[in-house]
Each structure stands twice: as C-alpha cells, then as structure tokens.
Amino acid sequence: MFIELVHIGFGNILAMNRVIAISPPSSAPIKRIIQESRTKGFLIDMTNGRKTKAVIFTDSGHIVLAALAPETITGRLSISRGGAVKPELVDDKLEL
C-alpha cells in the first residue's frame, strides 16, 4: 500500500491517504466536534501551540488540528501529486 505523507507544518507530517476532509475551525459545529473529540481522546493537536487554522478529519475517527490553512495543506498535496489535485471552494468549503 502506498502511503502519501504531507508536511502540515512545524515538523509534523500526516498520511494523506487517511484524510477524509479538511475544514477551517471557525464554525460552531466544528468547534463542538473538536471539544467532543478532545474529551473522547481522539484529538491530535499538531499546532505546536499556535493558532488552529485547519481541522483534518481522518478515516479512523481522529481529528487533527493544524496551524496551516486548509488551502496551504491541499496545495502541498497537489504539489506532491504533480498537480493532479485541483482544490476548489464550493459553498465556502474546500473540496478536492
């Protein structure tokens, strides 16, 4: 199985084949999901103490917090795939 690793800032690397969605943390439902996953022990904070700019949902049910913007992360994914991924905004949500 091929594992695609992408740098998500400050020395943190994420396996992108496990990612379901990337979202900004600004909405109330996303903030609620972050709090619930923190209490259940499914939250992975990769911000290194910086402001959370992206919330990454994985297929294992874990929630990953990143200090890079969703556009930056998908841009790095696009570069690693040779430009094969074209992220676009649909209803203010980033879709691959």
Swiss-Prot record:
Signal sequence range: none
Origin: domain of life: Bacteria
Entries under InterPro entries matching the protein: RemA-like
PANTHER family documented for this protein: REGULATORY PROTEIN SSL2874-RELATED (PTHR38449:SF1), REGULATORY PROTEIN TM_1690-RELATED (PTHR38449)
Protein family: Belongs to the RemA family.
Protein name per its UniProtKB record: Putative regulatory protein DehaBAV1_0033
